[in-house]
Regions:
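Conserved Radical SAM active-site core
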Residues: 3-41, 45-149, 153-158
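N-terminal amphipathic/basic-hydrophobic helices that include classical n-h-c signal peptides
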Residues: 1-2, 188
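Conserved strand-turn element in the central/C-terminal portion of the radical SAM core barrel
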Residues: 166, 178-200
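Surface-exposed alpha-helical segments enriched in charged/polar residues
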Residues: 84, 118, 175-178, 182
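Active-site glycine-rich loop that binds ribose-phosphate moieties when present
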Residues: 169-175
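Short, surface-exposed, charged loop/turn segments at secondary-structure junctions
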Residues: 143-146, 163-167
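Charged helix-capping and loop-helix junction motifs
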Residues: 109-112, 171, 201-202
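Short, solvent-exposed loop/turn segments at secondary-structure boundaries
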Residues: 105-108, 162-164, 199-201
Length: 202
């Protein structure tokens, strides 16, 4: 039983289709990335690059719109089409740069992410994953070349409740990471700083 199941299970209410999925990036976690969800239910209150970018270009209209994630319903079909073209170019495919592959409490997003990672691994490509949600124990059954990470901004869960209201509690993130680590998976933690003086941070 995955840890997030102790909380409420949330439902995806929006779906979109895309023409492409995989693209080249300079992000430090991989040389290619994919974003199979638009938006992020974690709703971070400090400046979020992904939210600001998507709002600027009209992909979302408001913070509330951003916090109601839209799942790319043709994710697996796009991977079937694109992986043969990219498989000899990709060193590491990162999930995800502008969203979270394991949004806290979203079964449907979790299942799509697991299916995508399996499909990517079956093509001989390893993945890196970064989340503020819960890394599911099912990842243990996928390639041990994959790299699984969590983001932590503060160990104060009161801060998390104020500034990352939809994200997983810190102890649950760490506990899930420990399960994968003890099962022999490659694991890591990203520590992010924040600016206390920022207007959005109060």
């Amino acid at each position: 039983k995955d840890l997030y199941e102790v909380g409420s299970v949330k439902k995806v209410t929006k779906y979109i289709s895309r023409k492409t999925l995989i693209y080249k990036t300079d992000v430090e976690y991989g040389d290619y990335t994919m974003n199979h969800v638009l938006g992020c239910s974690h709703g971070c209150k400090y400046p979020c690059y992904a939210y600001l970018q998507k709002k600027r270009f009209g992909n979302v209209v408001s913070y509330e719109d951003w916090c109601a994630p839209a799942l790319v319903k043709n994710t697996l079909e796009l991977l079937d089409h694109e992986l043969p073209k990219f498989k000899n170019k990709i060193k590491i495919l990162h999930l995800c740069f502008t969203t979270d592959p394991f949004m806290y409490g979203f079964d449907e997003i979790q299942e799509m992410s697991l299916s995508a990672i399996k499909k990517i691994n079956d093509a001989g490509i390893k993945c890196s994953v970064l989340t503020k949600g819960i890394l599911p124990t099912a990842l243990v059954n996928l390639s041990k070349d994959n790299e699984y990470g969590i983001t932590i901004v503060s160990l104060d869960d009161g801060f998390r409740e104020r500034m990352e209201p939809g994200a997983a509690p810190i102890i649950e993130r760490l506990s899930a990471l420990k399960v994968l680590h003890e099962a022999g998976c490659k694991t890591w933690v990203r520590f992010n700083g924040y600016f206390r003086s920022c207007r959005l941070c109060g």
